[in-house]
């Protein structure tokens, strides 16, 4: 254990490298000592400039891993970025996006999942810094076992951000690449559009318009109000969520017939377009016994009651989808077999009992597509016609790795298996959703549970760690539908404004599965259902117009972060004033080139 620096190498050589596409410096590091003995460990770095673009590539290349067990490689290091000026700022893709001026008064805390790419800590594998209109974009070309770390003390005067690489199945194993693009006269819009161009070059940009050619029901989802409800909650006594002091809080049940009546009521109240996301619909209850989740909850009405609810939804032209889960692997599942749980290189199998279902490990994602096919066939066999399906945590939590020889899996392969689950649903005409959004999922994910700003996941009133900016939407607004929290937290903070600014879909009602978790806080202004419907209609009407449009620009009006404006590719703009708690929607007839 401990830190080893590049300059600790006993032998370091450099050579100039010229190729047909650029030139750079190849450096070789070897002769590292451990307990006084020279180890065979050896690696190279290649830093080169691409002639056609001027982009700078930094490559870390393992040659021999014998002798040292490397846990993390911190390279390239952070840029020098110290001056207490608001025009010097850092862009992080922590959830929807955050802009940290060097003058920001709040310290930046460690992001969720420690800033690992492919998680909620980094929806996209890049960061950027801009100083007085000049900046750089750092893209991790090999993001699967990589992340970032950032440091900004309260009040500045600096922000440091850099890449790190981590092992895959216990070894560094493969070449790691970071690409730097340097820009003049740039801002966060330029940065995001530069990254979008990169994604398009890779063939990974897939718009909703393109997806709707294969699955036309996408057009029906655009403009819907989102309704998040549940059927059965059962908290196992050995779950961390179990409350022995108040056992009546642990379990509750709502019948399918009751939910059906609520749908009828919403229709009578004038709700025209609606999507119902249904939790806890199966016999075990929410977050229990996955992946063996059926049958439909008998106490709530069974398959017959569930089918009646679905048929009523379809009678009104509404869309229906279920919550499902193919990562959490519960020991209570009848088919549970430790041989198919994710196994670490040291032979251990991670376990916890955080959620309602109690003790669990993680299902190796190589198995997930098979369980998806099995379970969705059972739903189809019972006449449940699904429009959508939510596969929990796939786009929020890190990819898993598994070292079981029967189904060895890298993190990169894990993301590919998760995408296979989405693709299977698309083939069946079912629109796939997951918890949040992520760069790796854009080609196959249609919508999400939410894609919030990071501050929305902390208790109301917690100081913001930077200025919330829609970095993800500046890249991918026209690719993935995102419903937004609509809570009015106080007279000074209304999440509806963020929903409008982002051109997203509204939550009509969002019943969180766990109290004070995942942004579902009780501290908010109470509203009647009529008020919620009225507010959701405003957001739905806007989403109907801009849901398939690119967000072409985001700005601070007259440089004021409290007054923000977005412009979409069809000319519609949204301006919100967070101080006055007002919004304005206009058609500026602005078209992107």
Language-model regions, residue ranges each:
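Carbohydrate-recognition beta-sandwich/jelly-roll modules
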Residues: 1-276, 281, 300, 316-319, ...
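Short acidic, gly/pro-rich beta-turn/loop elements at beta-sheet edges
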Residues: 37, 68-70, 83, 286, ...
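Short, low-complexity, polar/charged sequence segments that are solvent-exposed and flexible
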Residues: 47-53, 77-81, 294-297, 339-343, ...
